[in-house]
Amino acid sequence: MSKPLILVTNDDGISAPGIRSLIAVMQEIGTVVVVAPDSPQSAMGHAITINSTLHLNKISAENAAVTEYSCSGTPVDCVKLAVNEILKQKPDLCVSGVNHGSNSSINVIYSGTMSAAVEAGIEGIPAIGFSLLDYDWNADFETFKPYIKKIALEVLQKGLPDSVVLNVNFPKRKEEDLKGIKICRQAKAMWEEKFDKRKTPQGKDYYWLTGEFVNHDKGEDTDEWALQNGYISVVPVQFDMTAHHAIQALNNWDLNK
């Protein structure tokens, strides 16, 4: 029986510790091809490159166990190039991450990590985005390798519903403090942005984005609650953004009179 073909990408860049851990786990499962940004692309969302050239650089040796490419574009560019130019086929699974920092709640909208997974889902590829609630470059990814493998194998064996990808977030906890895996909904939270106004040496104004993450949702079925209480959160994310519950109300508007 042939091994599954697995595409690995991220938004922190191809040299980030998180993706190196993810590659190691995927090697235990299947044949791995890596296409990841050549520099950090955090918070790029679903951006694609249309007004400049894209460059791929094969960085793995010909006989290497894992085929690796760095890409000058965004995480979504990486997935598009991988499927259409490198693999020339759909892989059995696409995994993105492991991100340095949480992508729970509203962060899923801004996340390059999750946008890469969503792009794979749009292409009809089962996909998972993994993130760790720890921004330290030397964060402990080893603790979560067994959970990454478990979730990836479940997706490979059972598949995912149409137009759905998984958003998996790990709490910053030691192994003995983890309470398990919890299927959740996305918490209703947001960033309250502020801009730090500064001046260049030439006296021109510029701005530095700051802010505070505010969780207005106290539900115990949310990803934020799960992470704060020692659970690994798994949220099924859909990329059909239609607000189906609002269609009937809008049909009652007098738009055709």
Swiss-Prot record:
Q: Does the keyword Nucleotide-binding apply?
A: yes
Cellular compartment(s): Cytoplasm
- Does Nucleotide-binding show up as a keyword for this record? yes
Give the cofactors, semicolon-separated.
Answer: a divalent metal cation
Catalysed reactions, semicolon-separated: a ribonucleoside 5'-phosphate + H2O = a ribonucleoside + phosphate
**What residue ranges carry the coiled-coil annotation?**
none
Where a divalent metal cation binds, per the record, is at 11-12, 42, 99
- Known EC number: 3.1.3.5
- GO molecular function annotation: 5'-nucleotidase activity; metal ion binding; nucleotide binding
Entry note: cofactor? Binds 1 divalent metal cation per subunit.
What Pfam families does UniProt report for this protein, alphabetically?
A: SurE (PF01975)
Instruction: Return the GO cellular component terms, semicolon-separated.
Output: cytoplasm
| Keyword set, alphabetical order | Cytoplasm, Hydrolase, Metal-binding, Nucleotide-binding
Q: Family, per the entry?
A: Belongs to the SurE nucleotidase family.
Described by its record, this protein's role is as follows: Nucleotidase that shows phosphatase activity on nucleoside 5'-monophosphates.
Recorded protein name is 5'-nucleotidase SurE
UniProt organism field: Flavobacterium psychrophilum (strain ATCC 49511 / DSM 21280 / CIP 103535 / JIP02/86)
Record gene name: surE
